[in-house]
Amino acid sequence: MANQTKRILLVSTDRAFVQETRTAFAASESIQLVTVEKNITDLRGEIQETDCGAVIVDMDAANLDQIEALQRITRRLEGRAPIVVVTQEFNAAAVRILVQLQVADFLVKPLTTADLVRSCIRALQGPGREENTESHIYTFIPSAGG
């Protein structure tokens, strides 16, 4: 247990978003933020080479090329690192695709850094926590009779 530092890789071309995210994670001693200031479609192995605990991808979820690039990344990672997607696009088709790709979470801009940090921490905790947040459906049947 000498080194408990988790690396989070941020892929974004939005300089303001990158700076805000760096500032948000700077206070944490257990999380190291590594940034790649490229478009998701321009990545050529940066994520594969980086040993990361989670990946934050800032992308346009309505852009088919970027969705295909995200699909390649999810296949490359093979579930070893959760992916958190940050997008400005929020429509049913984009949500359906992100759910099918099994991203850990997706957030819509504008967002607060607190939401992003919370989402990343939840993603780093892994799937073992999902059982605690699973929804439960209760059905109440009224008594019928006379």
Q: Regions from the language model: what does each represent?
A:
Residues 111-119:
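C-terminal output helix
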